[in-house]
C-alpha cells in the first residue's frame, strides 16, 4: 500500500509537466511534414515499439510526434486531428492520426505518414500539398475510438517464460495516457512495477509464476487512477500472444 501511495504522488508531480493540450478543446498552431515510404505506411521500427501494428492501425494514417508530445513514451497511441492552413489546398476537416513514433524537424510537431499527409488536402490538390514538404497546421488531441476493442496487451517477442516478461500496450481508447503498469506478486502480497523500456513497451525481470494480474495507472479526463485488469494472463503465456484486458477506456 505504501508503495502505491508513493508511486501515485510521484506521478502527480510528473503530470504537471505533461502537455496541457491533452485535455483541451483548443487547436494549437504548429507545423507538419511527411516522411518517405515505399508503401506510404509507417516505419515498423518506430519509437513506440508497435511493429507492424503501427503500420496498419487507423488504416495507416499515423504520425511521428515531437519529443514533447511523445513524452517519454506516454504519448504513444494518442490521437490527434491535424489540419493544414493553406485554404486553396487544405480541407476543413484535415486528418485524424494515431501517434506511433517520435521525431521532429524544422519546428514540426508531426511527421505524418504520406497517406495521412495527403488526407489533409482537398480532393485533387494532393500533389501540390506534397510539393510544399512542410506546412503550417493546427491540431488538437481527440479521443481514440477503437470499435470492438478493449485495452489489449501483447506479449513482446523477446519475452521468455518464466524469466522475462515484456508487454506492448495497445488500443488505449479515449483521451488517456498509460503512465505505469504493475504486476501482482501473490507470495509477497504486493504490486511490482514494470519498467517502461521504450514507447509502449513495459518489462519485468523474473515475473511471478502462474497467472499474472496487471493494473494500469491511467491519466485522463477522470484524473489519475489505477485500473486493474479483470482478465489475468495465463500461466502458460508465450511470446507473441495477445490478451484482452477487458478494460474499456473511453
Swiss-Prot record:
Domain of life per record: Eukaryota
Keywords, alphabetical: Glycoprotein, Secreted, Signal
Residues with glycosylation annotation: 72
Subcellular location: Secreted
CDD domains according to UniProt: DPBB_EXLB_N (cd22277)
Pfam families: DPBB_1, Expansin_C
InterPro entries per the UniProt record, alphabetical: Expan_Lol_pI, Expansin/allergen_DPBB_dom, Expansin_CBD, Expansin_CBD_sf, LolPI, RlpA-like_DPBB, RlpA-like_sf
Main location: secreted
Gene3D superfamilies per the UniProt record, alphabetical: Expansin, cellulose-binding-like domain, RlpA-like domain
Family assignment from sequence similarity: Belongs to the expansin family. Expansin-like B subfamily.
UniProt protein name: Expansin-like B1
Organism: Arabidopsis thaliana
Amino acid at each position: 500500500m505504501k508503495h502505491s501511495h508513493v508511486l501515485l504522488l510521484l506521478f502527480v508531480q510528473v503530470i504537471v509537466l505533461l502537455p496541457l493540450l491533452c485535455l483541451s478543446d483548443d487547436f494549437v498552431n504548429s507545423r507538419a511534414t511527411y516522411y518517405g515510404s515505399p508503401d506510404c505506411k509507417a516505419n515498423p521500427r518506430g519509437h513506440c515499439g508497435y511493429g507492424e501494428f503501427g503500420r496498419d492501425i487507423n488504416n495507416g494514417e499515423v504520425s511521428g510526434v515531437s519529443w514533447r508530445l511523445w513524452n517519454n513514451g506516454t504519448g504513444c497511441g494518442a490521437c490527434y486531428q491535424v489540419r493544414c492552413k493553406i485554404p486553396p489546398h487544405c480541407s476543413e476537416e484535415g486528418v485524424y492520426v494515431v501517434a506511433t513514433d517520435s521525431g521532429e524537424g524544422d519546428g514540426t510537431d508531426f511527421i505524418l505518414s504520406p497517406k495521412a499527409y495527403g488526407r489533409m488536402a482537398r480532393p485533387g490538390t494532393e500533389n501540390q500539398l506534397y510539393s510544399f514538404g512542410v506546412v503550417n497546421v493546427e491540431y488538437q488531441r481527440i479521443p481514440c475510438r477503437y470499435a470492438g476493442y478493449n485495452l489489449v496487451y501483447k506479449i513482446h517477442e523477446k519475452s521468455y517464460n518464466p524469466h522475462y516478461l515484456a508487454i506492448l500496450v495497445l488500443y488505449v481508447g479515449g483521451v488517456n495516457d498509460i503512465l505505469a503498469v504493475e504486476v501482482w506478486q501473490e507470495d509477497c502480497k504486493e504490486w511490482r512495477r514494470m519498467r517502461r523500456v521504450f514507447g509502449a513497451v513495459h518489462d519485468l525481470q523474473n515475473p511471478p509464476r502462474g497467472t499474472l494480474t496487471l493494473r494500469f495507472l491511467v491519466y485522463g479526463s477522470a484524473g489519475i487512477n489505477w485500473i486493474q485488469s479483470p482478465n489475468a494472463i495465463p500461466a502458460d503465456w508465450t511470446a507473441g500472444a495477445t490478451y484482452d484486458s477487458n478494460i474499456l477506456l473511453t
